[in-house]
Amino acid sequence: MKASEISSQKIMDSIRPLPEAGKQEQSSAERALLPPEMEAAGLSLFMDGDALTLTDGTNTLCGDFTRMKKRLREANLRQELLVKAARIKSLQDDRKPVILDATAGLGEDSMLLAAAGHQVELYERDPVIAALLADALRRAAEDPALAEAAGRMHLHSGDSEAAMREYAQRMHRETTKKSEICLQNKEDVKAEEKCAETQKRDSDQAGMNGDETADAELTAIDIIYLDPMFPGRHKSGLVGKKFQLLQQLESPCADEEELMQAALAAEPAKIIIKRPAKGPYLAGRKPSYSLMGKTVRYDCLVFPENHHV
């Protein structure tokens, strides 16, 4: 069975608790349904207590938001560079921008954004990583200190590039439809002005059509967040031997230009790109500005014409 044929839900459904005798005695029947290449590498998934866990027989890794609680305190959140990067001043009613995290991983960056009040749509293409993240979100939803933020995080197991392009197409279709309705309404208004006394019924109907246009408006994505795997480096927050487990599943970004073009096609008001502090720009695209940390920086591409107010 190919990795593409195994969904995160199938993986979750196939999980069995770890036998009391320990990891090494776990039979093949008790292991999760995994891609053949993962099993060949000696990796397996099991339930360690309440947590879905990835192991190579020596090291283990699971999604865990509980260790982030200190960072999620309001005073600390305000100092997070990513939270600062996600600000857009021109939105109406001081609402928080809606964010699409196109490279979710284990979701730690998205948790920061959700704790800051953002709705976050998370995309993770690797089914095993998506399963680890889904399990972490399940446990977070049961933790009073994390439940509110977890409730703003919506996980999609799949290819974010395809999702962003499909979103762009939907927005284009909706914009075209709205433009056609608006044009028709304007033509109706002109006709009404010429024969207001004899065509009042047509005038009333045109007004009704205008109301329907507002109701059909799609919820827009304001910000797209990209944190692709950088060759020779790794995502911040995952270090040492535990990271090596995840690295066997998640490969460096194969085509930076394709990822960037998919994000641009969705026409967000801002694209935020997480990079190593001294790393090159993603796809060679110079940002509008950058926020620099000790080990990482956030390159921000701003598109005022795309602000969804």
Model-predicted segments: where are they?
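Intrinsically disordered, low-complexity terminal tails and inter-domain linkers enriched
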Residues: 6-29, 168-220
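Mobile active-site "lid"/loop adjacent to the S-adenosyl-L-methionine
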Residues: 228-259
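SAM cofactor-binding core of SAM-dependent methyltransferases
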Residues: 98-100, 104-145, 157-158
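A short, acidic, amphipathic alpha-helical segment used as a generic capping/interface helix at domain edges
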Residues: 163-166, 170-171, 251-264
